[in-house]
């Protein structure tokens, strides 16, 4: 059978006592994949490869994928490849008369790929390693096919492996404009892009599945970095496909698959890997098995990773109490190439962790138990009285089907479905206080976030006179459901509190259902590509009435209305990129979009006796207009032969209107002059607006011996008023990160099969606060912080004499400098951490 693999997909996982539950359905997926492959391969007929000696080709420069399709069509040969192999890659084109082998070589020059002949045609594989050591660097741009890809930052598998991150947030923290917020504790991280850090402001997508978790003083991302092969970051509201919300941007993550692990001449393999981090004495144990059929009809992967660490050490030598990391993750993945035009991808992933920890993962120290409690309960039990035992499970399942006949450029149809679920169960010991935890989910709580998404889209390529079109049309359905329940034993005999079992009034349950349609056309004329597009969203929020009558009062004066609210609206976008010269590309985007309130914002309540008791069903949508302009400089053979330098500069401005925010402080305009506010007042309201603007510079340099990168980001943001007073003075936005620069400088030593280098992180002080414009707004402020610089080292060794062996070492905070990241809210940074790993492929 011959194949042209247009689309591939996603993942699987598990852990500990529940590992069997995770592996079971995933194994059934892989068994199905193998059986289906056998059926289709038995039905297929081999087609002899036809290769002309020499022929004329005229393939323009641009995206690598259509260029390869054009070459294969012209030569009348079958070419097998996956979208992951060519994503974000371009070609200089091909003009003239060539033999087929030379044509492939020229078209693939610089891509790291080569065309390998098979019995039925050709298969795209990783190019054979060169004599010199090649160290991929942080990608400045994902591609230059349109303005969105030109503004996208990308981390590839080499970047991820070099950092050896404990979590996704610390991995992305080195990209300009992207910051980690929260604490180093497991599960204590969230992400901030361009000064926007709420869950609804940063979309996270893992193998096509929306991810998100919002719980008081908890992190929002729990993904194991060891399982990732690629991370794309779209900054700002400029990608129409990213859905309602995501004003800060979208982070799209892809997990590894068999094609990433296998060498060109292999159809089966495995991996064993061990890593150790000295700071928390953490061991990381990983293993994988992967393979593909002889002719590439199917591939599959099973990957396991287990973290087992102790308490994290601060620079001063003390440790974060109860910060140990105990997480296990499984990934399983299979691609079926049903025909030469169809691909089916099945994937599943599961991660689990449990252990004693503070309720608020985003915190530094914990107040130690009193000596009286230690004497009464013993040291360990006294500590556990102020902790929770947290059991967390995170699962992802997805399936994707793609139909893309080469002879029909108008048809490239993709249908995908994804299911994501994150659960947390917290329980305090029976001897913990019965009266202290109403505001922190009681003595036991159950929280579940479930996302389901179905997407259908088609991409058509055609020409109209001198114009080339890439027309994308799609529809999407997304349902987000959150369930919450807590047990508060102090009210176990009270009917108004439903005898202790009820939803936290500050964390309501409910559903958000979004139906969307989007249309986008990338129109190219020579070196200019203009991309107009529009998206329509229909969003319905429905609250779940609280079980406790205290927070579900039938009296209209309480304002406890959990009924549905619907929002609709359009989101237009216009982007352009102009390849002015072979070394300079200019790009720009203008977008106007909106977001509906999330469940918390719409349905949070307080008791009827409060001054703001009601739900917030009268909220307007929050709107944003984003403008981005930038330039990409790309040079080759600049200092030495075959070196390269790439620089991207970006200026942006986001103007928000009707910001959805808590109603606190000055509750209404009449209250400013001593008047009375109408009742009932809602918990949330719309503030006038805000402006966030900034500049970014990203660059990298690579040569035979030296490589390096530099990234710089400066952002400022102001509200039109105070967060506590919509009629007050302008105030700084608290979540704006300080000016930051990241640098990497490395040296390759080919004769040793090694590379080593230095990293530097330079952070300015952050001395802007909402309290500067309104002293009473200090409750919304973050503590001001001093500037600091951190230095690190890294090295890698891949001996050619030991096939498949690799050793890495990285040192973070080399000089053990004491520092407090601004978005960490006074939480200390991590002390010196020496991280090393050894792996063997077989």
Q: For each of these PLM feature ranges, what is it?
A:
Residues 68, 72-88, 92-96, 104, ...:
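Acidic, small-polar-rich N-terminal luminal/periplasmic segments of exported/outer-membrane proteins
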Residues 259, 270, 288-386, 765:
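Periplasmic-side early beta-strands and strand-to-turn transitions of outer-membrane beta-barrels
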Residues 458, 524-530, 539, 639-656, ...:
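Gram-negative outer-membrane beta-barrel transporters
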